[in-house]
C-alpha cells in the first residue's frame, strides 16, 4: 500500500462562485508524482459531474435573437447570463425551474423557483433588468452531467418550444500540478506533488480530489481481476465455427459443387481433410475445379489447403 501524506497548505474563497485549494502530497516514489498528478488532473477536469441549465422557455419568445418589451437585455444576453448560473444538486434526474417577476425589478438567480434538492450557489447572479411593469416569465430545464455540451438543434418532444443553451457542467475551473524532488534520509530521493485546484463553488477543492480519486479507483479496480482467454482457446472456437460452414457458402460452379457432393464432402470440415493433391484424385475433378475451390476457400474464409498429403 502506498505510504504518503496529503496536506492542504492553502485554502480560500473567492466570492460566492470560487474556491481555491493548494495541496501537497508526499513522499512519493520517483516518477509517481507525474503519474498521480496527471491522472488526478485529467479526472478532476473531465469526469466530475455538475449541474447546469440546458434549455430555456421564455413567454412570448420564439428564438434567441428576439427582444422582450420592457426588458433591458435581449434574449441572447439572458441566455449567456443563465449559462453562468452555478447549482448544487445530487439529483441525477432532469428538473424544471421557473421564475415569474413583475417589474420594475432586477432579476437574479435567487428568485428562481427550484425543487428542494437544487441550490443556487450565488443567489445574486444577475439575469436581467425589467424596466417597467412588464411580467417576465421563464421556465428552464436543469440537468446533471460531465464536461461541456453545445446547444443542440434537435430537441426532444418535451422541449419543442425551449431554446437550447451551451451548458458547462464542470464544477472545477482549473487544475495545476507541479512535482518537486525531496531528499528523505541520506540517500533516498522522493517526489513531492503540489496540486492546485480552482472550483466554481458547487464543490470544494477537497471534494474535487476525493471524487477524482474515486473515479480513478473505480477505473483501475476493473483491471485487478482480468479473465484472459488464451489465444489457442479463441482459435479453437473460431476453427470449430468455420468447420461447420457448408460448402454452399463457397459459391462454387455447378461442376465443382457436384463433384464434391458425390465425394461426400458437405462441409468445410470435410473439405479440410483433403490436400490440394488429393482434390485432383476425386472423380471428374480436374485442375480447374481444384483451383476454383482453393481460391474460394482463401477468399471467403482465409483458409489454405496444404499442397500435399501429410502423414
Swiss-Prot record:
Alpha N-terminal domain (alpha-NTD), as annotated region: 1-227
Gene Ontology terms: biological process: DNA-templated transcription
Any Pfam family hit: RNA_pol_L
GO molecular function: DNA binding; DNA-directed RNA polymerase activity; protein dimerization activity
Gene3D superfamilies: 5' to 3' exonuclease, C-terminal subdomain (1.10.150.20), DNA-directed RNA polymerase, insert domain (2.170.120.12), RNA polymerase, RBP11-like subunit (3.30.1360.10)
Stretches the record annotates as Alpha C-terminal domain (alpha-CTD): 242-311
Broad class of enzyme this protein falls into: transferase
EC number: 2.7.7.6
Catalytic activity: RNA(n) + a ribonucleoside 5'-triphosphate = RNA(n+1) + diphosphate
Localization (cell): Plastid, Chloroplast
Known role: DNA-dependent RNA polymerase catalyzes the transcription of DNA into RNA using the four ribonucleoside triphosphates as substrates.
Protein name as it appears in the record: DNA-directed RNA polymerase subunit alpha
Organism expressing this protein natively: Porphyra purpurea
Gene assigned in the entry: rpoA
Amino acid at each position: 500500500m502506498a505510504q504518503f501524506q496529503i496536506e492542504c497548505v492553502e485554502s480560500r474563497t473567492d466570492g460566492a462562485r470560487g474556491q481555491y485549494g493548494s495541496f501537497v502530497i508526499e513522499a512519493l516514489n520517483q516518477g509517481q508524482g507525474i503519474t498521480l498528478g496527471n491522472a488526478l488532473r485529467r479526472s478532476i477536469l473531465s469526469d466530475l459531474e455538475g449541474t447546469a441549465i440546458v434549455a430555456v422557455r421564455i413567454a412570448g419568445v420564439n428564438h434567441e435573437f428576439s427582444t422582450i418589451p420592457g426588458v433591458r437585455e435581449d434574449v441572447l444576453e439572458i441566455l449567456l447570463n443563465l449559462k453562468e448560473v452555478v447549482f448544487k444538486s445530487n439529483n441525477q434526474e432532469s428538473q424544471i425551474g421557473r421564475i415569474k417577476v413583475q417589474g420594475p425589478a432586477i432579476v437574479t438567480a435567487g428568485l428562481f423557483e427550484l425543487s428542494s434538492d437544487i441550490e443556487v450557489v450565488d443567489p445574486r447572479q444577475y439575469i436581467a433588468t425589467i424596466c417597467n411593469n412588464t411580467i417576465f416569465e421563464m421556465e428552464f430545464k436543469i440537468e446533471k452531467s460531465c464536461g461541456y455540451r453545445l446547444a443542440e438543434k434537435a430537441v426532444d418532444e418535451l422541449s419543442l418550444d425551449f431554446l437550447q443553451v451551451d451548458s458547462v457542467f464542470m464544477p472545477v475551473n482549473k487544475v495545476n500540478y507541479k512535482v518537486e524532488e525531496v531528499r528523505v534520509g541520506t540517500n533516498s530521493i522522493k517526489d513531492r506533488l503540489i496540486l492546485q485546484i480552482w472550483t466554481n463553488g458547487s464543490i470544494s477543492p477537497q471534494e474535487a480530489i476525493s471524487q477524482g480519486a474515486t473515479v480513478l479507483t473505480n477505473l483501475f479496480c476493473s483491471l485487478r481481476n482480468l479473465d484472459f482467454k488464451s489465444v489457442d482457446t479463441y482459435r479453437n472456437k473460431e476453427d470449430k465455427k468455420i468447420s461447420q460452414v457448408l460448402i454452399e457458402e463457397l459459391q462454387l460452379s455447378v461442376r465443382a459443387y457436384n463433384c464434391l457432393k458425390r465425394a461426400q464432402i458437405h462441409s468445410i470440415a470435410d473439405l479440410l481433410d483433403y490436400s490440394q493433391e488429393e482434390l485432383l484424385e476425386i472423380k471428374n475433378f480436374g485442375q480447374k475445379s481444384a483451383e476454383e475451390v482453393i481460391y474460394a476457400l482463401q477468399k471467403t474464409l482465409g483458409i489454405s489447403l496444404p499442397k500435399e498429403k501429410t502423414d
